[in-house]
């Protein structure tokens, strides 16, 4: 309750206070570049910030997104920074996120909107709010962008959003979902903003706390981890017992509420292993089923390595 009251006091929020004109996308990689492109297509004045000069040059060359170094004139900050270690993409790291938060706190104008789209451990957004000294509207709107199906699972799809306080949440929903949608949200019907404000037109599902929004993303990927690990475990079971995994999977998947996945070369990528570790590290009570799933994936990787080695020996 203290943070809600303090935010309302320091931000000095009024319902019609912020105009969303000048948008800065921080991080122009696999996630940030499509976000910047989408925001620009919606008619906003979009700029980019990235430590990688090649990423900045690429954004300007492809979409005309200009780079900017000073944050003083920005209305909305959309943060799309990677939250994994450079030398180990399965390990979470938020040092870059904290550094950019300090830059916003130092240079930006009070009362602006800061939206974290990066996947973060539980409690991170509120830590950022503290670094920002309660002077900004801060929300977490985790991305659901999927590169292989961008047309279906791109920037504009149903998303979860949470704010560090009610006024932050209202402002975030107005930017993403639009005033008309905001008025339809439970407990947000009293909001009446200026309908001339543009929005991204992205449907948002609001939750009661920013921590719930943070958890929603990492739980999504932890659930995916479990599904893949089960497929890996079942594959090894079938091989050990002379059963066709494909035939069994196809038969089981005829049931309407079952969808066993196809195991491949282990659980990898930038998101699923890292986010599963975020979930495991989010509580002193560890998820036994996820820990077991990690062991299954390790066993499966070793199993695949042995299979490849055996095939190579036969071919030679």
Features from the language model and the residues they span:
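Structural/interface elements that position substrates and couple domains in central-metabolism enzymes
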Residues: 1-316
């Amino acid at each position: 309750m203290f943070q809600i009251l303090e935010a309302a006091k320091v931000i000095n929020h009024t319902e019609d206070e912020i105009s969303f004109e000048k948008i800065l996308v921080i991080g122009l990689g696999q996630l940030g570049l499509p976000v910047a492109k989408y925001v620009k297509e919606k008619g906003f004045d979009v700029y980019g910030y990235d430590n990688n000069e090649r990423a900045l040059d690429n954004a300007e060359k492809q979409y005309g997104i200009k780079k900017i170094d000073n944050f003083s004139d920005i209305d909305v900050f959309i943060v799309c920074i990677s939250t994994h270690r450079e030398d180990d993409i399965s390990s979470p790291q938020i040092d870059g996120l904290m550094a950019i938060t300090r830059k916003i706190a130092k240079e930006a104008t009070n009362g602006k909107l800061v939206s974290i789209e990066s996947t973060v451990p539980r409690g991170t957004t509120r830590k950022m709010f503290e670094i920002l000294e309660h002077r900004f509207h801060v929300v977490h709107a985790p991305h659901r962008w999927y590169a292989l199906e961008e047309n279906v699972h791109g920037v504009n799809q149903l998303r979860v959003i949470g704010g560090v306080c009610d006024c932050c949440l209202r402002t975030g929903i107005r930017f993403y979902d639009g005033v008309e949608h905001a008025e339809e949200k439970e407990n947000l019907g009293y909001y009446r903003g200026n309908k001339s404000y543009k929005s991204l037109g992205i449907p948002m599902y609001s939750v009661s706390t920013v921590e719930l929004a943070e958890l929603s993303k990492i739980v999504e990927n932890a659930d995916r981890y479990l599904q893949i690990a089960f497929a890996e475990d079942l594959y090894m079971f079938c091989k050990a017992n002379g059963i066709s995994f494909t035939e069994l999977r196809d038969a089981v998947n005829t049931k309407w509420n079952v969808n066993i996945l196809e195991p491949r070369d282990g659980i990898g990528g930038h998101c699923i292993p890292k986010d599963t570790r975020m979930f495991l590290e989010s509580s002193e009570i560890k998820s036994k089923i996820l820990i077991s799933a990690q062991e299954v994936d390790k066993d499966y990787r070793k199993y695949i390595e042995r299979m490849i080695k055996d095939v190579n020996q036969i071919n030679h």
